[in-house]
Amino acid sequence: MKFKSIAFALAAIAAVAAKAPASAADLELLEAGKLQVATEGTFPPFSMRAPDGSLDGLEIRVMTEVAKRLNLTYTPVLIKWDSLLVGLQADQYDVISASMDITAERQKKVTFANGWLESGGRIVVQADSPIKSAADLKGKTVGALVSSTFAKIAEDKGATVKGYKAESDAMQDLVNGNIDATITDSIAGAYAIKNAHMPLAMTDDFVSRIQKGFAIKKGKPELVKAINKALADIVADGTYAKLTVDLIGFDPAPKEPIQSVE
């Protein structure tokens, strides 16, 4: 009887431990019980404000679910695009979740969790623009996020690049006629044109094919592993599809996610 009591007690302790928040030491978190995540809040449908003022969007939903799977509280930190990497290196948050493309150059500075979304770059123009493809960008003024993949693409095409700290500012400048085009994520562009009722259009060609990743400061392998497992579980059990299809009408999970490189 005594042994049974001990067994029950051990089982109860194990159950509590399984539900307990991961410790800061285990996952190299800045604060125990919290997953502090940098996001912009200005890039629909990835990160934006819902009608009630709360944060919503693809990356908000997915990262909130990741935190839940890790028994952590999702804690957003609103940061402008050009300060994201600096803040991560300064330990202002644990993860960057800001529609960041996984590139070889960025992999030298941060560790990305496995790719969580597949998309591509598209050119957005005014509805009556003569720009029909990337070949037409030469000599034009093209808006793009500062230090982004799309800014480099526009520059390589011979365009004069105007940098922005928020995608929404570039789209509005395009509507106002201050730039000739902007290059943005295809999902974001389609969402803005449809839901913000902007008089804009996208050209047919993709200027890039990309995967987006959650960025983590180098030297935190346990946190990377934990996020990768949570992402895989979310996709496998159908939760990812439910979270994303509801917002954009399809499942953007990569068929072959780019793997983490320390």
What are these regions, as identified by a protein language model?
Residues S83-V86, A98-K108, D180-S208:
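A ligand-binding cleft/hinge motif common to bilobed small-molecule-binding domains
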Residues A24-S99:
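Extracytoplasmic small-molecule ligand-binding "clamshell" domains
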Residues I60-R69, V146-T149, G213-P252:
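Extended ligand-binding regions for polar small-molecule ligands
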Residues T39-F43, V77-D82, D91-T103, A127, ...:
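Beta->alpha turn/N-cap motifs
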Residues I60, P76-V86, S129, V146-S148, ...:
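Short helix-initiation/N-cap motifs at beta->coil->alpha
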Residues Q36, L72-T73, A90-A98, K140-T141, ...:
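Alpha-to-beta junction loops
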Residues L117-V125, A190-A232, F250-E262:
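Periplasmic-binding protein-like
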